[in-house]
Amino acid sequence: MKMIRRQALSLLAGLAAAVTLPLGGMAQAQTMPAPLDNPGEVKIALVRYLSTGDFFQAYLSGVEQQAKALGVDLRVFDSRQDAALQADMVDQAIALGVDGIIIQHGLTESMQEAAQRAVDAGIKVVAFDVNVENKAIPQVEQSDYLLGKLALEQA
C-alpha cells in the first residue's frame, strides 16, 4: 500500500494532464507515471465544479478513459456549480478513504479549506483550473486567452 500512495501523486498529475491532450495539445505530460503494483486498490476522486458543455464532457471522458487504462477505481463527484456542495464532496471523498483527489475548477474561497483537509488526511491532491493557494497541491492550469488565440489562428 505504501508504494501505491507514493505513486498516487504521479497518477493524479498524469490523469489531469492526459485529459488536456485531446483538447488541443497545449499541455503535455513530461513523463508517464510508473505502473502500479495493485492498480485496483487505488481510489481516485474527481470532484467537479463545472460539468456542462463540450469541454467538460471531453474532460470527464478523458479522465474515465485514463482511469480505465490504468485500472484504478475512479469516483466522480459533480457539484453542478454549487461551491458549498463541492467542498462537502471533497469531505465525502476523504471519508471514503481515497488515495487521491482531483479538484476540477471551483472557487478558491470554498476549496482552500477542503483541499487542506484532504492534505491533512494524507491524501494526494491535484487542482485543475482552480487556485487553492496551497504549495503542497500541484496546480494544472490552462490559459483561456492562449487557447482562444490558437483557435482563431487555426480558423
Label for each model-derived stretch:
Residues 2-14:
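N-terminal secretory signal peptides and thylakoid transit peptides that target proteins
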Residues 33-62, 66, 70, 74-88, ...:
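Extracytoplasmic "Venus flytrap"
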